[in-house]
Structures are given as C-alpha cells and as structure tokens.
C-alpha cells in the first residue's frame, strides 16, 4: 500500500523562555520519524513547515499540542505523496519572519475568518494588501489586490511609509494577507503605528482561505517554500490556469525553476518547452556560462538548493525559506 503524507504549515506567537532547549527537544522527538521539516523557534514562538508520513505527522501534532506553550497551536494540513524538504531542520531564529525592525506584537490588526474575508472582498470597500514577496504574488494573488514590488519582507516597513503617504490612514481600511498568517502578525503592528485605523488580517492566511472557502476570489496558484513551489489553494480544484508567463516565450506558465547556471541559480518562470530548449537556463548569457549544470528533466522543477534564491542573504528572511 502506498504511504500517505501530510504537509503542515503552522506558527504560534508565544513566550518561549528557553528556545534552545525547545529546539533540542524537537530534534530528539523527530530524529527517528519519517518526516522532514524547516522549523524556527525563538523567544517569540515557533514558525514551522513540516512534512511527514501521516501517522508520524499525527504523532508530532499531538506531541506539540501537549506542550504547555503550544497547546492552542493550529495546523494547516495538505495531503501530499512524499516528504517535501531535504532534511529535518530545527533552528534558532531571533525573528520568526525577518521584518528587520522591532514590533509590539501586543498591537494586532483584527483577525477575520476566511468566510468573513470572502464577504468583505465582495464589498469592494477595502485596500487589499498582499504582504508577500513579488515572486510569490506573481503566480497567484487575490483579485484586485495591491501587489508591492518587493523582494524581501525586510522592505515592508519602508513600504508602510509609502502607503501612508499615498492614501489617508484615517479613512483607508486595509485587508492584509500572506501565505499562512505569520507575516501579517508581524506587519500589522507596523501599519497600526503608521496611523491606519481599520486594519484586518486573514486568519490562517491564504492556506486557510483555500481550505475553508475554496478558490473563491483567488487567481492562480500559491507559492510555497518547499519542493512543490506552487500549489492550488483548493485541493479539490487542481486545474488552475496560470496567470504568469514564461520568461522566454511569454506563454502562460506558473512553473518556477532555478537557473542551471550555477553562478546565477535565480528562480525564473518557464514553460515545459522552453525549459528543455534552453537547457534549464534563464537566458542566453547564462546558457553560455562555463558553470552550467546538466539539466535533469526527471527532477521536474524541484528547487536546486545549493545556492537557491531563498539562500541569497543570511540577513534576509528569504534565507529561511520558512515564510508562511
């Protein structure tokens, strides 16, 4: 019988007095299980992405909920065919999602459920703000969303200044969303500090919206920081038309690849025909590089992690590949 796996996305903001002890306990519990993960723990709480054989994933969820600090944690679950991370990674990270500035986490925008969010979208009254990176929203976003041309989460505090100048914070209601919710937890205090009076955040992020509402007002696919890279937000509606384009021929495509030029390795969008024609490279210059690795079509578009886009900078949140 074929083994079945879960993909889990979760975070919890809570005081953790000894995060390094928590990390050690996690590693000990997970070491003999058929799982892979990328988990960050700090004094702020936990931010995790996880995959595992279903019984082992169930064990982990039960174990974590039995811990005093994490009894109220919520898991968002997808069904998958195999583990989607290369290994078990549990690390300390001071900022669970690297915003690059101190925030008062006690000041939060109002959480609204996916159903409430869907209803508010139809009112067409609020500014819909996507607080993900540009390469994420390029393949999928809410209809009529404001899409900041930003490559790392650290750029968003500066964007809040710009937004406050472009619209009146006193009278502009804002609905903000991200993949799983944690970036909104950290960014909503910034918007409130800039004077925005009416700010809402999508509880559980786009993942929860897809699971509870369906495709709804969402266009395209959802970028995820694991081997899948792009997924439909509704598992029952997998045939989603691409909203992005191949960088070579401009035909519709939502497939990201790492450039086969080892010195480039950038993420780029490409159709199936062009990825073979250009041997996995993002452009003509890269295809002529002496350090082009052989394109292996059997890997599909699985990330090449040695110098993946999500590892460009140790000082950016994209180094973690654990934004949800």
Swiss-Prot record:
EC number(s) reported in the record: 1.14.-.-
Catalytic residue positions: 178 (cysteine persulfide intermediate)
Entry keyword Oxidoreductase: yes
Residue intervals of the Rhodanese domain: 122-218
InterPro entries: Rhodanese-like_dom (IPR001763), Rhodanese-like_dom_sf (IPR036873), Rhodanese_C (IPR022111), TrhO (IPR020936), TRHO_N (IPR040503)
GO molecular function per UniProt: oxidoreductase activity, acting on paired donors, with incorporation or reduction of molecular oxygen
Enzyme class at the top of the EC tree: oxidoreductase
Keyword Oxidoreductase: yes
Catalytic activity field: uridine(34) in tRNA + AH2 + O2 = 5-hydroxyuridine(34) in tRNA + A + H2O
N-terminal signal peptide: none
Superkingdom, natural source: Bacteria
Gene Ontology process terms (BP): tRNA modification
Keywords noted in UniProt: Oxidoreductase, tRNA processing
NCBIfam families linked to this entry: PRK00142.1-2, PRK00142.1-3
Family assignment from sequence similarity: Belongs to the TrhO family.
Annotated function: Catalyzes oxygen-dependent 5-hydroxyuridine (ho5U) modification at position 34 in tRNAs.
HAMAP family linked to this entry: TrhO (MF_00469)
Name of the protein: tRNA uridine(34) hydroxylase
Organism, as annotated: Chlamydia pneumoniae (Chlamydophila pneumoniae)
């Amino acid at each position: 019988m074929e083994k079945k796996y879960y993909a889990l996305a979760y975070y919890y903001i809570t005081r953790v007095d000894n995060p390094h002890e928590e990390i050690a306990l996690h590693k000990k519990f997970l070491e003999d299980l058929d799982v892979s993960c990328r988990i960050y723990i700090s004094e702020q709480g936990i931010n995790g992405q996880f995959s595992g054989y279903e019984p082992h994933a169930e064990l982990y969820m039960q174990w974590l909920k039995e811990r005093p600090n994490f009894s109220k944690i919520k898991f968002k679950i997808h069904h998958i065919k195999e583990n989607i991370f290369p290994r078990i990674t549990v690390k300390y990270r001071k900022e669970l999602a690297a915003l690059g500035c101190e925030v008062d986490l006690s000041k939060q925008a109002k959480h609204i459920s996916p159903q409430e969010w869907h209803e508010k979208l139809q009112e067409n009254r609020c500014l819909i703000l996507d607080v993900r990176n540009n390469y994420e929203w390029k393949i999928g976003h809410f209809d009529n969303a404001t899409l900041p041309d930003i490559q790392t989460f650290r750029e968003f505090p500066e964007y809040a200044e710009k937004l406050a100048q472009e619209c009146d914070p006193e009278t502009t209601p804002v609905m903000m969303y991200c993949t799983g919710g944690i970036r909104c937890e950290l960014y909503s205090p910034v918007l409130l500090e800039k004077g925005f009076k009416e700010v809402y955040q999508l509880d559980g992020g786009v993942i929860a919206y897809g699971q509870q509402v369906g495709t709804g007002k969402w266009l395209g696919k959802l970028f995820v920081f694991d081997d899948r890279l792009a997924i439909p937000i509704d598992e029952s509606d997998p045939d989603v038309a691409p909203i992005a384009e191949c960088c070579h021929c401009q035909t519709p495509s939502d497939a990201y690849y790492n450039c086969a030029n080892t010195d480039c390795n950038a993420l780029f969008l490409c159709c199936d025909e062009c990825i073979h024609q250009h041997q996995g490279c993002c452009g003509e210059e890269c295809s002529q590089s002496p350090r082009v690795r052989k394109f292996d079509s059997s890997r599909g578009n699985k990330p090449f992690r040695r110098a993946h886009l999500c590892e460009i900078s140790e000082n950016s949140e994209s180094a973690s590949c654990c934004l949800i």
